[in-house]
Amino acid sequence: MSKTAIITGAAGGLGKGIAERLANDGFNIVLQDINEALLLETEKEFKEKGYQAVAYKSDVSKKKEQEELVQFAVTEFGQLDVMVNNAGVDAVTPILEIGEEELSKLFNINVFGTLFGIQAAANQFIKQKSKGKIINACSIAGHESYEVLGTYSATKHSVRSFTQTAAKELADKGITVNAYCPGVAKTEMWDRIDEEMVKLDDSLEIGDAFEAFSSEIKLGRYQEPSDVANLVSFLASNDSDYITGQSILTDGGLVYR
């Protein structure tokens, strides 16, 4: 029987790239996103390519909806094997201007959503009496905090912490928990970050902030979704069975830890 993976935030960007790679690896795919229109487009595209994929619209920040997502996957495909907590949002705000609304939004999605995904998947693995793999979206900002990305950085440090804690507590149940830490990618998220940084600095033009970050990458290019998907593919495979609690940088040589 083919294995099953849930990927949250899978309608576009890195999440879509991860989902396509796992589909090519032979997984049944549950595509989750809150953007229903884009989600259904991605589901159609996947099915046209012959992938075993179904879409599920939900809000990852709601614990009950994360539990229902996992149950949907089990109903559709019989069991769950891999949970990729990819969904996340960003914000670009100077430290003195960060407010309650931004904090609530980012922590609800990036932190609560990841934790609730960990819990829902782990409980299903335990119920199945099977090993399972939980893979979280961290970031270079989970290793090093960045100016005007304070809230985002704080949420990704939290994701790294929950990844370590979950790995320690779930190891004796055969469940591994790891995270991938992307760097600078040409995605909608980075386009938004670039645009917001221009608003904060009159000397910048669109593309300048992205190029400034990219210029520091030692391997000489910005990140493609496939760079992240390759790591997630490994973490979802049996080859990674002896790795847990790690938040692995995949940034082309930008942050060194």
Curated annotation (Swiss-Prot):
Q: Which of this chain's residues are annotated to bind substrate? A: 139
Native source organism of the sequence? Staphylococcus epidermidis (strain ATCC 12228 / FDA PCI 1200)
Q: What is its EC number?
A: 1.1.1.304
- Gene field: butA
Which chain positions lie within coiled-coil regions?
none
Q: Does the keyword NAD apply?
A: yes
Q: Taxonomically, which superkingdom?
A: Bacteria
Q: Name one Pfam family in it.
A: adh_short
Q: What Gene3D superfamilies has UniProt attached to this entry?
A: NAD(P)-binding Rossmann-like Domain
The protein here is known as Diacetyl reductase [(S)-acetoin forming]
Q: Where does NAD(+) bind?
A: 6-30
Q: In the UniProt entry, which residues are flagged as the active site?
A: 152 (proton acceptor), 156
GO BP term, example? acetoin catabolic process
